[in-house]
């Protein structure tokens, strides 16, 4: 078992859309479908409290576990290990949202949390760490829980959302991106992949060279926000 927690993993590296990856995505998708199929049961106070508590535990537990693993294996670095990616930030904000039921956090995370978690789940930057390594397991628990937490709050909540909320979220993401770019320059880091593309396969590979892939990613982000907004309006009719 020790080999599944070591940083020098002697196993097949992670392959995008391998059998293990597809099965993991299928499990998360099935859980999402079950949330909607059993939404009347999920809305019951006892069930909703249990699910919110469960996801808070999974979100924080997976992130704390990841940070402990990074430190224990001497992989932790201020340039790579701070929770500054949008998907990582969404983990902590999702935990706060589940506890407080904040409308503002829900609106922000419905766009950013779902959008970033889908991208992270579909094109994870895992390098050599394939299933059943602890890095793989913690990664998918973390980002899968963000995705499912946002869907859970969409099901049990009565939040109203207009186009203004969409554009405020776009503005906040861009302001955050500028701050992260400055941090990247200061640390020599690559948070949010603003200075170069990630090493593994990702959507950015088809969006052109730096800095044009950032402009293309911005357009895709806005388009995806509109799709999520449209789906939410249909669901809440």
Swiss-Prot record:
GO annotation, cellular component aspect: plasma membrane
Record's bilayer topology term: Multi-pass membrane protein
Pfam family, one: TMEM164
Transmembrane segments: 16-36, 53-73, 80-100, 106-126, 137-157, 167-187, 212-232
Keywords annotated in UniProt: Cell membrane, Membrane, Transmembrane, Transmembrane helix
Keyword Ligase: no
Subcellular location: Cell membrane
Identification of the protein by name: Uncharacterized protein YwaF
Organism (species): Bacillus subtilis (strain 168)
Source organism phylogeny: Bacteria, Bacillati, Bacillota, Bacilli, Bacillales
């Amino acid at each position: 078992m020790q080999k599944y927690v070591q940083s020098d993993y002697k196993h097949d590296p992670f392959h995008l859309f391998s059998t293990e990856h597809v099965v993991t995505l299928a499990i998360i998708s099935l859980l999402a479908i079950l949330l909607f199929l059993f939404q009347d049961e999920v809305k019951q106070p006892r069930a909703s409290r249990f699910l919110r508590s469960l996801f808070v535990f999974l979100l924080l537990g997976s992130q704390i576990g990841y940070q402990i693993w990074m430190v224990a294996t001497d992989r932790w670095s201020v340039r790579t290990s701070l929770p500054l990616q949008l998907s990582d930030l969404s983990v902590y904000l999702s935990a706060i949202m589940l506890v407080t039921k904040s409308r503002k956090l829900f609106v922000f995370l419905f766009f950013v949390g779902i959008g970033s978690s889908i991208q992270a789940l579909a094109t994870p930057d895992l390098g050599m760490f394939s299933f059943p390594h602890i890095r793989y397991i913690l990664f998918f628990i973390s980002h899968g829980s963000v995705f499912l937490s946002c869907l859970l709050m969409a099901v049990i909540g009565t939040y109203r959302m207009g186009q203004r909320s969409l554009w405020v979220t776009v503005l906040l993401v861009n302001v955050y991106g500028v701050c992260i770019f400055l941090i990247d320059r200061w640390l020599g880091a690559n948070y949010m992949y603003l200075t170069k593309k990630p090493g593994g396969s990702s959507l950015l590979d088809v969006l052109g060279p730096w800095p044009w892939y950032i402009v293309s990613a911005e357009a895709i982000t806005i388009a995806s926000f509109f799709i999520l907004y449209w789906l939410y309006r249909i669901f809440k009719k």
